[in-house]
């Protein structure tokens, strides 16, 4: 099977594996990127990618708050150029304000919320699409009511990552902000290990076992010793995706969970948005685009 050079390049960027290894992985996986990543990991040829989803869609994410509520949202555009357009940025801010003043609990409800202009969010998006010349869409949002505990938002400077955290008790604003910044940087999938689904654990253990098959030293160990080693490897992998088990980026001498425990607070909600998570953008070169229009 022929392998597209673009796929090899993309797989190398994700996994840091060698070119020929990436080619073999794609051949063995029928050119499926996700399956190729698993193949490389099973054969010990790639690092465990923190982010295996292909992130390609453009736009921005934003977290914003008022006295009663917090909202985090993602609005997509077709190009990065438009995502930096002042009209686009103003529209996203207008949508955030409208959602903050609503009780919308679903995307369908959110689209019907009216903005200060008198238009619904859906109508505003249609108008912006016509004015800007690209499809503009509200992809997702979450609206959270403030409680007696602490809450914090973090928006990265590039407008591509935002986080929203809610704690059960009061926490110093600087400490809360540092934890929110940690979540943005380290991208944990779960608050703690108890939240990790069995499917995820089983998939990771399968990969670890496949990797172990090629390790002669491991295979020579007694079965009970090997089992404990594999369990240890799984625990290490799970700690990478569990916030409370990650080393705190502000001070790596302790874990995030230990830090929060020392402050007598628990994290009850964690939301992290990154532009385009899970969306695969179709990339078309100029020649192909022109050819398609001539058909």
Curated annotation (Swiss-Prot):
Associates with the EF-Tu.GDP complex and induces the exchange of GDP to GTP. It remains bound to the aminoacyl-tRNA.EF-Tu.GTP complex up to the GTP hydrolysis stage on the ribosome. Residues 79-82 are annotated as: Involved in Mg(2+) ion dislocation from EF-Tu. One of its GO terms (molecular function) is translation elongation factor activity. Signal peptide: none annotated. Belongs to the EF-Ts family. NCBIfam families: tsf. InterPro entries: EF-Ts_dimer_sf, Transl_elong_EFTs/EF1B, Transl_elong_EFTs/EF1B_dimer, Transl_elong_Ts_CS, UBA-like_sf. GO terms for cellular component: cytoplasm. It is found in: Cytoplasm. Keywords: Cytoplasm, Elongation factor, Protein biosynthesis. This is Elongation factor Ts. Pfam families: EF_TS (PF00889). Its main location: cytoplasm.
